[in-house]
């Protein structure tokens, strides 16, 4: 049975599943759908065509599904789809998609979005991610699974961050980040590999292989793209080579890599 505060304002067109809790002074618009076990604390606003998955908890003053902050948006149909078991903390803002993107913003499962996180239109966030306080995502950003982003970090539109990456706090990131990399700075560059996450997700032999692969890729000569092409030719059947090198070759913004920055950090770690 759902538990709904008397002061909540809920459209009769909204779909509220069983076991949902809606706190005082929440506002729920026409196209909103709340799956089982969703919990809204007080003063949450949900608008637009917004779906919130099972057992997701949204804290006070979060605003989800309002019109995207894009001057090209003219009221066309778009969606915000949020998966299961997410924690969305105070004052978060998440916008739906636009006609100029994929027409939806997607958030996976088991993510933590801390206070004041902003997720702009057409972003795609995987699962098991942590976005710390004040992280700002511009439009069309793609974030893979198991990514951690430190507080007060700003990320440029269309940037792609692959699985298992760590972005240090107060960074300004304008380029793509391949799998398992650690990035820091303004402008942010790759400083090394995310050892902690790799140990959680991979076997030791696979970690060793990925380390060796990145050392080959990040040599000054040949270029990063040429190195990625060579690796794909020589190790076409290796899944890690496919994942990492294909990501590099598909990058439209370029990779956040500078030889001097990566090598200095790796030498310190070694």
From Swiss-Prot:
Domain of life of the organism encoding this protein: Bacteria
Pathway: Glycolipid biosynthesis; lipid IV(A) biosynthesis; lipid IV(A) from (3R)-3-hydroxytetradecanoyl-[acyl-carrier-protein] and UDP-N-acetyl-alpha-D-glucosamine: step 1/6
Catalytic activity from the UniProt record: a (3R)-hydroxyacyl-[ACP] + UDP-N-acetyl-alpha-D-glucosamine = a UDP-3-O-[(3R)-3-hydroxyacyl]-N-acetyl-alpha-D-glucosamine + holo-[ACP]
GO terms, molecular function: acyl-[acyl-carrier-protein]-UDP-N-acetylglucosamine O-acyltransferase activity
A Gene Ontology biological process term: lipid A biosynthetic process
PROSITE patterns registered for this protein in UniProt: HEXAPEP_TRANSFERASES
InterPro entries listed in its UniProt record: Acetyltransf_C, Acetyltransf_C_sf, Hexapep, Lipid_A_LpxA, Trimer_LpxA-like_sf
UniProt feature coiled coil, ranges: none
Subcellular location: Cytoplasm
The EC number(s) this enzyme carries: 2.3.1.129
SUPFAM superfamilies: Trimeric LpxA-like enzymes
Annotated keywords: Acyltransferase, Cytoplasm, Lipid A biosynthesis, Lipid biosynthesis, Lipid metabolism, Repeat, Transferase
Cellular component terms (Gene Ontology): cytoplasm; membrane
Binding site for substrate: 69-72, 121, 140, 157
Broadest EC class assigned to this enzyme: transferase
Cross-referenced CDD domains: LbH_UDP-GlcNAc_AT
Record family assignment: Belongs to the transferase hexapeptide repeat family. LpxA subfamily.
Subunit structure: Homotrimer.
NCBIfam families for the chain: lipid_A_lpxA, PRK05289.1
Function description: Involved in the biosynthesis of lipid A, a phosphorylated glycolipid that anchors the lipopolysaccharide to the outer membrane of the cell.
The name this protein goes by in its record: Acyl-[acyl-carrier-protein]--UDP-N-acetylglucosamine O-acyltransferase
Source organism of this protein record: Helicobacter pylori (strain ATCC 700392 / 26695)
Lineage summary: Bacteria, Pseudomonadati, Campylobacterota, Epsilonproteobacteria, Campylobacterales
């Amino acid at each position: 049975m759902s538990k709904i505060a008397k002061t909540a304002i809920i459209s009769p067109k909204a779909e509220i599943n069983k076991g949902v809790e809606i706190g005082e002074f929440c506002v729920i618009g026409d196209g909103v759908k709340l799956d089982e076990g969703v919990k809204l604390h007080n003063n949450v606003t949900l608008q637009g065509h917004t779906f919130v998955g099972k057992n997701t908890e949204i804290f006070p003053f979060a605003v989800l599904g309002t019109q995207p902050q894009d001057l090209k948006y003219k009221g066309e149909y778009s969606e915000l789809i949020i998966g299961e078991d997410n924690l969305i903390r105070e004052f978060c803002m998440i916008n739906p998609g636009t006609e100029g993107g994929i027409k939806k913003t997607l958030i996976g499962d088991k993510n933590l979005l801390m206070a004041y996180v902003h997720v702009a239109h057409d972003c795609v966030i995987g699962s098991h991610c942590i976005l710390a306080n004040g992280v700002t995502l511009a439009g069309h950003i793609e974030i893979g699974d198991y990514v951690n982003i430190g507080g007060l970090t700003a990320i440029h539109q269309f940037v792609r961050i692959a699985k298992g990456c760590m972005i240090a706090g107060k960074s300004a990131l304008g380029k793509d980040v391949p799998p398992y990399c650690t990035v820091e700075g303004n402008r942010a560059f790759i400083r090394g590999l995310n050892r902690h996450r790799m140990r959680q997700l991979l076997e030791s032999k696979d970690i060793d292989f990925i380390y060796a692969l990145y050392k080959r890729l990040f040599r000054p000569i040949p270029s990063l793209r040429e190195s990625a092409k060579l690796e794909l030719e020589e190790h076409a059947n290796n899944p890690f080579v496919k994942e990492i090198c294909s990501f590099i070759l598909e990058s439209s913004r370029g990779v956040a890599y500078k030889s001097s920055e990566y090598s200095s950090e790796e030498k310190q770690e070694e």
